[in-house]
């Protein structure tokens, strides 16, 4: 079934590598930055993706986005024990799922560009910044301080990346997916909003609500390009009216809640609405990372607690993300 948001369903993009000059062919054009990166073999971004090794266990799990989202997802990954580490059955085995792994938290300090999608210019910039955030997170380049650009720091490469921003999922995911396909990179980058949407069980009569303080336009943009989503998006509701004594969940007869407010605990919603399917970002991210790392066979297999390190992602004058060591490394 198809989600009933608009009557327009865009065709899925087609990608190809043509001879020695890779390019993207698509019903929906990618931004110029992506086209230029694909064509320019000498660019740092092209070389980074061209040399990416899918089966290399070296590197870290990287979470990039706003502070609250990154902290929540990193904590969830750190404590995750949802699978048997031997045969991947969905049972607890008292061994942390990501034992021996390093979780890198990359916090985008200026969230302003993530909220400027209301204008065409802002949406275009957000699309470009999504790709740039991914490249910076996968790369090994970082600095000790922003004031001393000659003082390099050590940053392990990213082997799995979670981009937490729903705005990036709505506006920049398409461009990033297009770029990764050209380099045959799969099972590497995940968006919590997309992972939750994929978990919705039902049909077009399934009434879906989103717990979020972000504009509904953001989610309409995201679902416009998700033709396989099973359900009908009824509305986007801030936590205050979801948790109110007379909740919108009851008055709107919702069947599913997607939790996109990291200040709300999923267990609180499940206790309040026991008959509702509640999908939360932490759980779907844990599952996606675990299964992808098993498929690619990139666990370190070190017997140790997970570790984490922190970086700040700061935009420079050229609108490039510069990663610097964070105080909470």
Each language-model region and where it sits:
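Non-catalytic structural scaffold of enzyme domains
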Residues: 20-329
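Bacterial N-terminal signal peptides that target proteins for export
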Residues: 1-8
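Bacterial N-terminal signal peptides
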Residues: 9-16
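Residues embedded in well-ordered secondary-structure elements
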Residues: 8-9, 52
């Amino acid at each position: 079934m198809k989600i009933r948001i608009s009557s327009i369903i865009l065709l899925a993009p087609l990608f190809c590598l043509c001879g020695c000059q890779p390019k993207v062919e698509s019903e929906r054009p990618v931004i110029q930055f992506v086209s230029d990166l694909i064509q320019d073999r000498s660019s740092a971004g092209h070389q980074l993706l061209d040399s990416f090794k899918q089966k290399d266990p070296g590197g870290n799990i990287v979470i990039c986005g706003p502070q609250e989202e990154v902290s929540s997802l990193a904590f969830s990954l750190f404590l995750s024990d949802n699978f048997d580490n031997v045969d991947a059955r969905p049972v607890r085995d008292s061994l942390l799922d990501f034992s021996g792994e390093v979780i890198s938290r990359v916090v985008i300090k200026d969230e302003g560009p993530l909220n400027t999608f209301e204008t065409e210019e802002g949406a275009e910039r957000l699309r470009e910044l999504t790709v740039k955030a991914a490249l910076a997170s996968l790369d090994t380049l970082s600095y000790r301080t922003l004031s001393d650009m000659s003082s390099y720091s050590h940053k392990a490469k990213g082997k799995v990346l979670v981009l937490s921003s729903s705005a990036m999922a709505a506006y920049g995911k398409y461009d990033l997916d297009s770029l990764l396909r050209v380099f045959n990179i799969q099972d590497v980058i995940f968006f919590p909003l997309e992972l939750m949407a994929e978990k919705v069980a039902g049909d077009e009569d399934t009434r879906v609500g989103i717990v979020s303080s972000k504009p509904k336009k953001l989610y309409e943009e995201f679902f416009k390009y998700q033709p396989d989503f099973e359900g009908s998006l009824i509305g986007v509701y801030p936590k205050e009216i979801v948790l109110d004594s007379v909740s919108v969940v009851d008055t709107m007869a919702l069947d599913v809640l997607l939790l996109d407010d990291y200040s709300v605990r999923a267990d609180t919603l499940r206790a309040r609405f026991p008959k509702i399917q509640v999908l939360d970002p932490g759980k779907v991210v844990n599952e996606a990372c675990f299964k992808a790392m098993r498929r690619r066979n990139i666990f370190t297999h070190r017997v140790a607690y997970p570790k984490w390190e922190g970086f700040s992602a700061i935009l420079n004058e050229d609108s490039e993300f510069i990663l610097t060591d964070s105080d909470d490394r």
